[in-house]
């Protein structure tokens, strides 16, 4: 993309040196870079992908808490107010919470928008630039293969972080393995709901989903895989065949496919070393229970950008020490992840899902701290914004 730099600006006194280099044009990486650039740092983002939004590996579903951290253009989203939770026998419950919603997104478009915003803040973005390693010499981080140096390096390069590997930092060791297909938008999918399927034969340790997305229908599932070297993979075709009675997906045009590991073991240790810090998926900032990480990418990406700026500009506290205190612990959710990974039998799920305790638990999982069951779904209301993707708001 011609609005992103291909090489350092030769007009700068030291064009190959930056205050901060961010590895990974991820949600966390771009938010951190934008924040640091707004605060006056000279920032570079490097990413091996050819352009922002390429090879996306996330469903891009935002919980309301994530939306509150970062304003996304409405034209790139679709609002969903409820969750329909299916038992293995295909009976279901509908869940809502007053004032709560999810946003399905056109994720590649969101990434392109966020990259433009980061560049507009003053950061230099280098796509097609692969991180191969770095060393810290005399309080300076050097990336010899890219002929770049920095005062600080931030690893936001995903679940299998090369930055973590090259500096001997903590690495993710527990994963879900996810697979998703984007289909053309189909009228057989009720747009009021995230459709979530519990089935420990087809999706042991997690679930399957059908999402009325922003201009598409997203269908996927993930399975608990423990160590990434294990052989278990999602049986996507079996899952689609199982749910076809509801959505008739086999005749729909496929627009895109994606797959990859989702860290679910909590925050890694150690997070940092001298002049180097991890954030986002690289740091394990993904809920072990729900596998959601964008909320944490927004919140802590912004915080990391601020803390690094204070450290470099004002003699502030070491960013690694600050974020080790501030990153979430995920204690209860880690235990719940281990319990669900044990894959309770489908017969038990069929019996338990419709009991008040299980419905209350599902309400808490989907709608955070907003307890209580809501039997009536919110009224649809027209929205003044002309959004070509939105079925309702």
Residues covered by each model-derived region:
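Beta1/beta-strand and adjacent pyrophosphate-binding region of the FAD-binding site
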Residues: 14-28
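Glycine-rich FAD pyrophosphate-binding loop
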Residues: 21, 25, 34-56
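N-terminal FAD cofactor-binding segment of flavoenzymes
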Residues: 52-84
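Central beta-strand plus flanking loop segment that forms part of the substrate or channel wall
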Residues: 60-61, 160, 165-196, 249-250, ...
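Conserved N-terminal helical subregion
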Residues: 69, 78-166, 173-176
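FAD/FMN-dependent oxidoreductases across multiple families
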Residues: 131-133, 227-304, 313
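Active-site substrate-recognition segment that forms the wall
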Residues: 197-228
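C-terminal helical "tail/cap" subdomain of flavin- and related membrane-associated enzymes
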Residues: 306-393
